[in-house]
């Protein structure tokens, strides 16, 4: 069993670990580079691009969590391109991930309605950005315990929580009422 299935059933081995999502990243990059030529209205283009940026940021964040700096490929690669891309520093990766998330935050709505419910919202992406900033401030990526990383994470998460709550999101008052 591979991926999450292997984890669920206790069958995960070193040979079955599959966390190298450059295929998905390549597909996202192709979509981002070619969407402008498509016959789609601007509002839909903006929405699709924002959602693709979130997915790319999420995929890169998963790799950075495991490996630190990874090669950041932001354009579709042709078959003739060099496969040995230089590894970016962790700080460069985090900055590019945050840039993708910031671009998505600017483009996404606070809430979706109708058939679009369940898509990424501004609140979701702000929460993800806050989480990534906390990871970047943590001992895993901040062994020198630089205070400015913690301050950045705190300031952003506080602002994000206030904006998210002001736009109708929040925590349930009672755990038992969730069910």
Where are the language model's segments positioned?
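An aromatic- and glycine-enriched ligand-binding surface/loop that stacks and positions planar moieties
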Residues: 1, 68, 94, 101-105, ...
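Helix N-cap and loop-to-helix transition residues
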Residues: 41, 78, 89-91, 121, ...
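Conserved, well-structured interaction surfaces
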Residues: 1-67, 82-95, 101-115
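Short linear capping/connector segments at secondary-structure termini
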Residues: 74-81
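Short, flexible active-site-proximal loops enriched in glycine and acidic residues
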Residues: 67-73
